[in-house]
């Protein structure tokens, strides 16, 4: 029988387990952020370079390269103050080309919904001159206006993006020449390459646009929402932020919002041949009221993965489609008596000859290994526990890396299973662990905390050996020890149907009942 973890009361933070022998908590101190653990965010492993990761500085003016072995800075990859032809002083985010040769830098970011936004993007080449120094020139991606979801081609020589619900393509080797791929995009009618509101909200993604492995094809999902009912709400001036246009009269925002029982967008998958400029519709057998929550090219340029769900979201199908012939063949089907969790989509990772898949078909969430043809080769994990996240596969060692709650539903740990099936726990501390691996799977950054320990961030090799401690929040732990903190109490109980539930409750430090 599955175990389900529940939280019965809200928590101040994970520091609720310290001794009750000191000062009382003060509301001003709580809301000031005084007890918030320090963290390291925005870490991006550098593609094609298994030894380093990158991070932008606190001022959002630089992108710095760090060593996975030591955690020490190695080089400043980008500096807005010194880059040539750079017209911005700060930036909001960035991403690498798949081969690590270029950066895509986002500025003037404007949020749309939970995951979506527009931004003005710039290209920065990391190509080095004969003296070993980076070329150091910034180029604007497009002069046509802000962009959504820009994505590099695998060879790093093209960028596709969406503007005003249409797809555009920029060829970087031809003076950043820009061409329009779709023409029918229109607000509240048709979206190309980006999901509508309900897809973005329910399936947690903001890009439905992919390049083929050989950089010769584009694939995208088209959302036709013309028949979806509209919903409107008023816009007021407000205070933070303040909108001047609505000071005297409120405005109105209208978008397509399908309530229960109403029609969703009609979705279809299309491909665009960059050389011939031919657009084709893929023949995917999706239900009329079904969903296409993801598309993704495999490492075979002639094999596009299309993922579908029925309206009840309890049947998942994975199709492999030929982007030119448009023929789609069913590779995998997974069904549930309840529903398919959305973490299935992003735990599917394609390798040259295989792909990973996570399913609850055994009663617990486990990792499976398939051939690229869709044949199940083996069940990688098994037992009465849940795989929480597939972290990657090392083809050289034949090893799988993942996080799971095998020790307890209240904990998470990092594990490795080698080609012989031997399982090794890599994280050494009991509590909550999460990991981010290097591009070559030789190193990882581990984030750990438990009831008595604020976040500790370490760098480790793939045997679990700690190479460096980046942050331990020791000062915060010492500070907290001087306060009367409420303490979490863990417990389990059984429901009337025999399901074991895990929970915790937190009482005031002076609670005596």
What does each of the following model-derived ranges do?
Residues 72-110, 137-146, 332-338, 384:
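Blade-loop segments of beta-propeller domains
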Residues 27, 33, 71-73, 108-113, ...:
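Predominantly five- to eight-bladed beta-propeller fold
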Residues 38-44, 88-95, 194-214, 294-295, ...:
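Signature of short aromatic-glycine-proline-rich micro-motifs recurring in repeat-based ectodomains
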Residues 41-44, 51-65, 74-77, 92, ...:
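Non-catalytic accessory segments flanking enzyme active sites
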Residues 60-65, 113-120, 164-170, 227-233, ...:
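Structural motif
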Residues 115-168, 174-208:
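Asp-box/WD-like beta-propeller blade repeats and closely related beta-sheet repeat scaffolds
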Residues 51-53, 103-104, 156-159, 215-218, ...:
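Hydrophobic beta-strand positions that form the internal "hydrophobic ladder"
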Residues 47-49, 98-99, 154-155, 213-214, ...:
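Residue-level detector of Asp-centered blade-edge/turn motifs that repeat once per structural unit
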